[in-house]
Structures are given as C-alpha cells and as structure tokens.
Amino acid sequence: MRTFNIATEKSHRINREITAPEIRLTGVEGEQLGIVKLFDALRLAEEKDVDLVEIAPTAQPPVCRLMDYGKFKYQEQKKAHEAKLKQKVIQVKEVKFRPGTDDGDYEVKLRNLKRFLDEGDRTKITLRFRGREMAHQEIGARMLDRLKTDLEEFGQVEQMPKMEGRQMVMMLAPKKRK
C-alpha cells in the first residue's frame, strides 16, 4: 500500500508558529497597536478570541495582525475564485482561404471571422497558394486587403500580410471595447 505526503502550501504563520521575539502589531479593525512582545500579542489574541497572523515576515520587526484566520483564508479563496472566473483565455482562431475562394464561401468565412473577433479571440487568416497560383500573389494580397477593410470595425491588423512558404498570413486582434 502506498502513502502519499501531500504538502499543503501555507503562506502565513499563525499564533505559536511565529518565532520573532518582538512584532509590529495591527488590530482587528486595521488600527496600529505598535511594536509589542510576542507573548503580549498572543495573550491579546487569546483575549479577543482571534488568531495572530504573520503578514510580512521579512519586515523588521515582522508585521502581524489580529484576525479570524479561517475567515481570512475563506476571503482569499473567494477572491482567487472570482479572479479565475473573470479571466478569459484568448485563443487564436484560424480561417483558411484560397486565391479562388468564391463570394459565397468568402461571406461565410467573413461571418465566422466577425464572430471570432466579437468573442474576443485573435484570428489568423491564412491564404494558401498551390502550384501556379504562386505566380499570382497579387490576387491573394487583394483578397487580404478586402478582408482588412471588411473587418475594420471588428478588429485591427496585428501582423500585416506576409509570405510564409506557400502561404500568405495575416493576424487580426479584436478591437478594444469601450
């Protein structure tokens, strides 16, 4: 049978874990109580039925605060969870064209590009040349210019069209919302 040691990340020392002989103490409401002996601070914490939490261990003397540690950890956890919910992962969506892409297909792909940019995703537009199409790169450049003007209100060009092997690539970033 295997046993695993799961190390829990503890960011703050509390109560008897604090080793400094003197500390700078902050009260429950955030008021400064000055520099006091550790023993006195622990006694005060016990009287008020709260924990003594080391906030800044590297300061001279270390800064400690009287607080309900369980409530403090819960608030921190809640803040981290809300921050995680608010962040949006920006993806790069790719739409591929060919120099001979017809108007109907062009409109469908344009609609998809608009949707991607509206959702806040960056888009990569790839125009692939095959065989003799390489001799007519100006057709591809015209198509990318047309895309650029059609998508002006949804996003701005992040990377101007450039050749990468047999492909012409252009990157668009969504416009910042006001």
From Swiss-Prot:
Keywords attached to this entry: Cytoplasm, Initiation factor, Protein biosynthesis
Which Gene Ontology molecular function entries are recorded, alphabetically? ribosome binding; translation initiation factor activity
Name this polypeptide is given: Translation initiation factor IF-3
Report quaternary structure and partners.
Monomer.
The text of the family note is: Belongs to the IF-3 family.
Naming one, the record's GO cellular component terms include: cytosol
Primary localisation category: cytoplasm
Q: Which SUPFAM superfamilies match?
A: Translation initiation factor IF3, C-terminal domain (SSF55200), Translation initiation factor IF3, N-terminal domain (SSF54364)
**Annotated HAMAP family:** IF_3
In terms of superkingdom, the source organism counts as Bacteria
Please give the biological process terms from Gene Ontology that the record holds: ribosome disassembly
List locations, semicolon-separated: Cytoplasm
Tell me the name of the encoding gene. Answer: infC
Q: What does this protein do?
A: IF-3 binds to the 30S ribosomal subunit and shifts the equilibrium between 70S ribosomes and their 50S and 30S subunits in favor of the free subunits, thus enhancing the availability of 30S subunits on which protein synthesis initiation begins.
